[in-house]
From Swiss-Prot:
Residues 163-175 have a biased composition (Low complexity). InterPro entries: Tubby-like_C, Tubby_C, Tubby_C_CS, Tubby_N. Residues 145-162 have a biased composition (Polar residues). The gene is TULP3. Its main location: nucleus. Expressed at high levels in testis, ovaries, thyroid, and spinal cord. Gene3D superfamilies: Tubby Protein, Chain A. Keywords: Cell membrane, Cell projection, Ciliopathy, Cilium, Cytoplasm, Developmental protein, Disease variant, Membrane, Nucleus, Secreted. The lineage of its organism: Eukaryota, Metazoa, Chordata, Craniata, Vertebrata. It comes from Homo sapiens. This is Tubby-related protein 3.
Amino acid sequence: MEASRCRLSPSGDSVFHEEMMKMRQAKLDYQRLLLEKRQRKKRLEPFMVQPNPEARLRRAKPRASDEQTPLVNCHTPHSNVILHGIDGPAAVLKPDEVHAPSVSSSVVEEDAENTVDTASKPGLQERLQKHDISESVNFDEETDGISQSACLERPNSASSQNSTDTGTSGSATAAQPADNLLGDIDDLEDFVYSPAPQGVTVRCRIIRDKRGMDRGLFPTYYMYLEKEENQKIFLLAARKRKKSKTANYLISIDPVDLSREGESYVGKLRSNLMGTKFTVYDRGICPMKGRGLVGAAHTRQELAAISYETNVLGFKGPRKMSVIIPGMTLNHKQIPYQPQNNHDSLLSRWQNRTMENLVELHNKAPVWNSDTQSYVLNFRGRVTQASVKNFQIVHKNDPDYIVMQFGRVADDVFTLDYNYPLCAVQAFGIGLSSFDSKLACE
């Protein structure tokens, strides 16, 4: 009798283990369902930032001047040089050096083959397929019926909006393709740290992957570079660390290896306890942990800081955010910023208003549309769904120059477009900060 009990016990343990796993999976599925319902209900609120519906009906109704902001706007100078300042996004450019895409939309054949260019890392495509990560992302299916021409619409020309020949300059002047101005993407690590070329908008997509047992609570984010002819290149991946008191996202140029010890680790995003302030770091070592053990060359740099305005009184409306980045040199390189303690961090200097060699950006205030009873921004066809995450980043001295814009096009698909002086890691970190929950801002 005792022997039979011993023989049955392993089977009983196995059944019990399977039941526990099923219960855990059912609980996770239920929590994910509740979260999705809450998010869908939240998107229907009038305080979400909506894409301007008049942006696609240009001839139907004239728009106000504040809704006609081009994605890239380099004003036509009276002389042959545009003045440049450290605290502004403008750059020293001659008119013949401004490469502006055409105003007209690109025409893409419906049966064009969707391909993905991956960085030249050995075995990257095989590793993507092995881990069931889609390397050929069909963005046209994920935008819920949005036409390709809307998603691939090019920004306005670099000439001034007040110019009388603006309508003909876009078609008459052959613009150099943006792909030729992005440089060599084979060295992916160098590319994600380099500022965007002046006069070029780097267009990207972020895919949020919730597949797997715990990815509903800790999803993985993949950032792709959009190229001509519907090609995409993988750039960055990030995932929120599980055992961390504050939000902590590790950023990697490898879609599979998202560990801090990996060779592909390029930075991280960390928040405070309330989730209202974030800092983007590179792959360097924390000066407090490596004091006296590492040289200055290996000390980590602060690439950006993001601060969301708290909403302690419960007033609803669009989020208000500020972005602080290091200034740029005359050679258009970012000034290395390596604080040795928290009192000298980007956030601390911004709060103390000691902004020497720093650049402060902020989100563009959306316009209240009385017809739709919602806040709207003109994303020029790049954002198609309402979300509190939709925003545009500008500088106060040049509010028409969109440094970065971010918004939703599907449930788990977002567009991210950035310009000089941001780099890919900075832009990705700013976008990730929008995903994280904020206790005092909702």
